[in-house]
Amino acid sequence: MSEQQVHSVTVELAGRPLTIEAGRVAQLANGAVLVRYGDTVLLAAVTASAEPRDGIDFFPLTVDYEEKMYAAGKIPGSFFKREGRPTETAILTSRLTDRPLRPLFPKGYYNDVQVSITTLSTDQVNDPGPLAIIGASAALVISDIPFAAPVGAVQMGHIDGVFAVNPVMGLMENSRLDLVVAGTSEAVMMVEASAYELTEAEMLEAVKRGHEAMQAVIQAQLELAEKCGKPKKEFVAPVVDTSLQDEIKAWMGNRFLQALNNSDKAAREAATDSLRTDVLEQFSAGVAEEELAARVKAVTKNYDALVKDEVRASILEQGIRVDGRKVNEIRPIAVDVGVLPRVHGSGLFTRGQTQVLTVATLGSPGDEQRLDDLGIETTRHYMHHYNFPAFSTGEARPSRGPRRRDIGHGKLAERALVPVLPEKDKFPYTMRLVSEVLASNGSSSMASVCGSSLALMDAGVPIKAPVAGVAMGLITGKEAGQFSVLTDIQGLEDALGDMDFKVAGTTAGITALQMDIKTTGITYEIMQQAFEQARQGRVFILDKMNEIINTARNDISQFAPRIITLQIDPSKIGALIGPGGKTIRSIIEQTGAQIDVEDDGRVFVTTPDADGARMAQSLIEGLTREAKVGEIFTGKVVRIMPYGAFVNVLPGKDGMVHVSELDEKRVENVEDVVKIGDELTVMVIDVEPGTGKLSLSRRAILTGETAEQRKSSSSKGGPRGGGGGGDRGPRPGGDRGPRPEGDRGPRPEGDRPREGGDRGPRPGNGGNDRRGGGFRG
């Protein structure tokens, strides 16, 4: 290995230094950099195959973002104690990085390119997401891999009414906006955002400010390339013989437009495939066998180019799309809710030949998803999962679980609904939504947004406002400024167009945004028009949805669990849980309830029926509530002692009725008045500070006295007979027991004084010591 030479550049971004360093690590990669922002450090390394992959017509780019637990000072919690398959965050970051880079590779470049990004250190302050894009771009810029221009990226927030560039992670909790924008020095390449109903103007302003802020990072990459960049490998795009296009078009005649202009996806694909087969037979006939493969490839490319040119030309020149719609026209919409009988909520949304069934399930707080990755350990009480089976596009392929695309689409729809969800304190349910794509002809992720809104309202979730989504497309012409923005794109327009611009929101504003492009950037003029057409389309779709359901049902489904929220003193959590969880398990067994206890004293009781909920509530309140002086209880006598009776007044809580408080008259024997199992109505006359021990009185109930009167009478003392209070109270440790041989023995040295003075020490008791009890008073 040659002598190590380290090169670095540092710029200030949002008031903090960002450093990109090359040459220290991964020297065998085509390009590698370390990116440091605060104490967050990422490694980005890129490699490319020496030769293009045979038999493909797409660019094989792979982006892998990996989170290493050591970066946060953690040991993986799995059995094997090592990182497993990528987390959701890792997959989303991989997709986020891929999208702005892909359009900047030359067309026809079919070499395998792998971008590997690893988080080596994280400070829980600076989000690694935008840094992954910067690192990948910098590694490509200094490598010998053909790549058009450096890409910068920043995160934008909107906190306290002010836009913020790269706010620290803690501040994002209070932000109305979470936007990642990436671009070159000239244009925006990628946008991904979730927002709390920002207007189109606010969102566009955030994109502009983000694009301005990233310029310093772009310039830093160029400076690094000047210091240590490798010469780019020479690449010449394969030449496609277009001479056949005119011949093929002339031979097809009217069949071409007849096959292409069809609103039915299946019929159109069948017609165009049949026509392609006929074209191949016609223009491959008589070709020598050794030249046949090349001829078939050339004819296919020419035919596909004709399809693309015709679709785009019709839109740009006539404003007409292949299914006959105008550029701002939305496909026919059908909406239904409550389509499944036993689920908690369901919505069926159909737009053209795209159809999504979304099902809502309500669970207990304990059903929350627990997240433990490089971020702070958190929980998620709202989840959306997106499934895209092969039959939805008429294909036959095995299902191997969710793909990256499925996870990305599911997360986009999830973000779109989060801003309108009720606060957890008011609606403590865990919500899981699953969108099943039943048919797909473009924009299935936005159909999932609409289906989610319908399913939530059908489930009785009090969302703040319905949410809808629409996907916008773009067709650009060869002349400068020639473009057409399409509303509600279908699959063919997505494949042959230049942009996929997805916007979700309410009538008040945007809640989610995602933009991908296939060109080297779009102008703000295009973006502004796309925002406005998306707003109009969103309002149109919401009107259609509101005709069926426009607010949450009055109650949740009869098949959904019921949740009661209780607030207890946090100091009582231990009493509720009990030693080793014994108490709370007992309640769960008795009631069939699921009980979740928060550190702040909130208790969530989830049961399938109201009776179990009420029983659990009663038991919990009894265990955790404090009896107050003056309260009256009716409870059973659970224990009798010579000095009084113990009565159970609350679950797990007994109080003592002293012998002097059992009756109006003097009581010689407690069992003359009550027996174990008897019900007794008593009043709380004192609660001992610190211990919470209860002093009870039956006498107050009989005489009509208040707790204060009984407590005062007891403390002052009084005649022993005829109901006078003032008894000495129980001795610690129980009764003194019977006197030896029935008599206390003679008094020492004469009689004790009758009036005043001290009684003198008791024989054999050491003066004032009364076995731990102090003076009688």
UniProtKB/Swiss-Prot annotation:
Q: Which GO terms describe its molecular function?
A: 3'-5'-RNA exonuclease activity; magnesium ion binding; polyribonucleotide nucleotidyltransferase activity; RNA binding
Q: What is its EC number?
A: 2.7.7.8
Source organism superkingdom? Bacteria
Q: Where is the composition biased (Basic and acidic residues)?
A: 728-761, 768-777
What's its catalytic activity? RNA(n+1) + phosphate = RNA(n) + a ribonucleoside 5'-diphosphate
Gene3D superfamilies referenced in this protein's UniProt entry, alphabetically: GHMP Kinase, N-terminal domain, K Homology domain, type 1, Nucleic acid-binding proteins
Q: Where is this region: Disordered?
A: 703-777
Function summary: Involved in mRNA degradation. Catalyzes the phosphorolysis of single-stranded polyribonucleotides processively in the 3'- to 5'-direction.
Identification of the protein by name? Polyribonucleotide nucleotidyltransferase
Q: Which organism is it from?
A: Herpetosiphon aurantiacus (strain ATCC 23779 / DSM 785 / 114-95)
Q: Which gene encodes it?
A: pnp
